[in-house]
Regions:
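A conserved mid-protein helix/loop that constitutes part of the nucleotide-sugar donor-binding site
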Residues: 19, 211-234, 250-256
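Conserved acidic donor-binding segment of nucleotide-sugar-dependent glycosyltransferases
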Residues: 325-337, 345-351
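Nucleotide-activated donor-binding/catalytic signature segment of Leloir-type glycosyltransferases, i.e.
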Residues: 254-274
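Donor nucleotide-sugar binding/catalytic pocket of nucleotide-sugar-dependent glycosyltransferases
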Residues: 39, 53-56, 138, 142-195
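Short hydrophobic beta-strand element within catalytic cores of glycosyltransferases
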Residues: 311-314
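Aromatic "clamp/platform" in nucleotide-sugar-dependent glycosyltransferases that forms part
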Residues: 294
Length: 400
């Protein structure tokens, strides 16, 4: 099958969307499909490399840290459109709602092929970056998503939470839930009797045998990492675990300041940004994966943590229903008391920790990269059968 993937983000950027799209790309290639990618370059220079089209872009940091948009005049539209039309994609799978989505629409118009779109970002959780009024921001996100759905044959939701939200928005195309997969060959429990774990903990100044809570991902306000620091401060000092943040982002200075304010510098570590191939070993540094975020759409880090054998202790969120099950592979908590109770239960019961570890591995096995790719391919076939690229929908093309 000839498949065009369109995403505003790609390596060397590190985030959940990039990991998801690149995993899909490599899985589709491994299955023998003809796959090309259009994405944004990290500068104003448009170029092609190994079947990937990089569109020149400019920074939009004032909107949100790390965001880029296609640069005016950077698109070699006629040359690339002619080339893609000659190639003839059977389906286009968009991963972003902005620059590459609009370019994908131009290709779809020429090739008369369906567009499948994965809705990775719950924009309701990001309205503070664009609007003074939260209500106005939510209304705008809903209306914009509904308009965008008119240019798609099918939308993919990474979780039931996102699917329910899209249905609440009354989007005009069918929505299918396809959880993001993980590479189980990369993520898994340690195979070296804990030697690497002990070494990495020693480098962080963490004594052997102490409990480590691990959070991995972008440090941004909407991820609510500050609550994790406050929850740690509320634990009894004599039995207080360590908290390790792996990742970087705009919220890091505030988190470091909060850590100092609460006198927790002796119990909190900031590992910073790590290379993608080093992510699995950092998960294994922890004993429990923790999160206070309610802005997740994929739950990718939860799956990865469980694939490394970590039980999950996370803020209750509909996106985790059926994934994190209380007492089976972790706990979902709603307040400080529930967090403290679950944490104490895990720490104080060695036999339970072993069971949680085994159940976490079993849960992660359901989200293999191979299963993920097959579900996406099934969605492509559904979109082709619908054959629903609407030629009368044209106004969005004027945005390019």
């Amino acid at each position: 099958m000839k498949i065009l993937l369109a995403s505003d983000t790609w390596s060397p950027m590190v985030n959940g969307v990039v990991r998801s799209v690149e995993l899909l790309y490599h899985q589709l290639l491994a299955l023998g499909h003809d796959v090309r990618v259009v994405t944004l370059a990290q500068n104003g220079h448009s170029h092609e490399e190994n079947g990937i089209l990089y569109v020149g872009s400019i920074s939009a940091e004032r909107v949100y840290p790390g965001v880029r948009i296609s640069a005016a005049g950077a698109l070699p539209i006629s040359h690339w459109l002619d080339e893609l039309e000659a190639w003839g994609p059977e389906v286009i799978h968009t991963q972003s709602e902005f620059s590459t989505f609009m370019l994908a629409q131009r290709v779809a118009r020429r090739c008369h092929c369906p567009v499948v779109h994965t809705y990775h970002t719950v924009y309701e959780d990001y309205t503070q970056y664009l609007f003074f009024s939260e209500r106005l921001g939510r209304m705008t996100a809903e209306k914009a998503t509904r308009i965008l759905s008119g240019y798609c044959s099918l939308m993919l939701a990474p979780t039931e939470k996102v699917r329910a939200m899209l249905n609440r928005y009354k989007v005009s195309c069918p929505v299918v839930t396809v959880p993001t997969g993980i590479d189980l060959t990369a993520f898994g429990p340690a195979k070296d009797n804990g030697e690497e774990k002990a070494r990495m903990r020693a480098e962080l100044g963490i004594p052997e045998g102490d409990t480590v809570l691990l959070s991995l991902g972008r440090l941004a306000a909407e991820k609510n990492h500050a609550q994790l620091v406050r929850l740690l401060a509320a634990q009894p000092e004599q039995s207080r675990p360590w908290l390790v943040f792996v990742g970087d982002g705009p919220a890091r200075p505030d988190l470091e300041a909060l850590t100092k304010e609460l006198k927790l510098t002796d119990r909190v570590r900031f590992a910073g940004m790590v290379k993608p191939d080093e992510v699995p070993r950092w998960y294994r540094v922890g004993d429990i994966f923790v999160s206070a975020s309610q802005s997740e759409t994929q739950g990718l880090t939860y799956f990865e943590g469980m694939a490394c054998g970590l039980p999950v202790l996370c803020r209750a969120d509909p996106c985790l229903d059926g994934v994190v099950e209380n007492g089976f592979n972790g706990w979902q908590w709603k307040d400080e008391a529930e967090f403290a109770s679950a944490l104490n239960t895990i720490i104080s019961d060695p036999a339970l920790r072993v069971q949680l570890h085994q159940n976490a591995l079993a849960t992660a096995a359901r989200y293999s990269a191979e299963h993920f790719a097959q579900q996406v391919l099934d969605a492509y076939q559904q979109a082709v059968a619908l054959k629903q690229y609407e030629p009368e929908h044209r106004s969005i093309l004027s945005w390019v």
